[in-house]
């Protein structure tokens, strides 16, 4: 069984990441014609807290997820209107209590790892979420590293 490297970063627990992926899949499934298609089935989530209070969520999905989320102007004059999946995802994480749960797990982890620190007050003030995207099966010429619109 693979393990995360000990980098001093808190990696969000797998059951929580699985619930996060389920939420994003539901958002997409409710919006697309084929709710059982490749895009929905390709969704994976990695999440960790880096620095001190920044929750970094990595969305791994088929490459065209970014075009659906951000929108795009096509070579033939067509337009893909932005679907704002990530903004909906952020709202759902907050309303389901998952963001609070992640920071609670992180506080617990810090208290075990560094029992002398009093971090709970700091974490409540400075929480922020950033997103990264990793494309699955990108076509030739696909530019990785494009930011997800939130």
PLM segments and residue spans:
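Short, Lys/Arg-rich flexible segments
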Residues: 1-150
């Amino acid at each position: 069984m693979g393990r995360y490297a000990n980098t001093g970063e808190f990696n969000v627990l797998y059951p929580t990441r699985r619930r996060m992926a389920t939420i994003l899949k539901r958002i997409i499934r409710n919006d697309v014609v084929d709710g059982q298609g490749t895009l929905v089935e390709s969704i994976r989530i990695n999440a960790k807290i880096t620095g001190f209070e920044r929750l970094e969520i990595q969305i791994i999905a088929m490459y065209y997820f970014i075009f659906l989320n951000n929108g795009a102007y096509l070579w033939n004059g067509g337009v893909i209107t932005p679907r704002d999946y990530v903004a909906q995802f952020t709202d759902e994480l907050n309303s389901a209590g998952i963001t609070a749960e992640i920071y609670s797990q992180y506080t617990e982890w810090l208290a075990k790892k560094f029992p002398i620190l009093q971090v709970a007050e700091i974490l409540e003030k400075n929480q922020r979420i950033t997103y990264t995207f990793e494309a699955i099966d990108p076509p030739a010429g696909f530019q990785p590293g494009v930011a997800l619109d939130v």
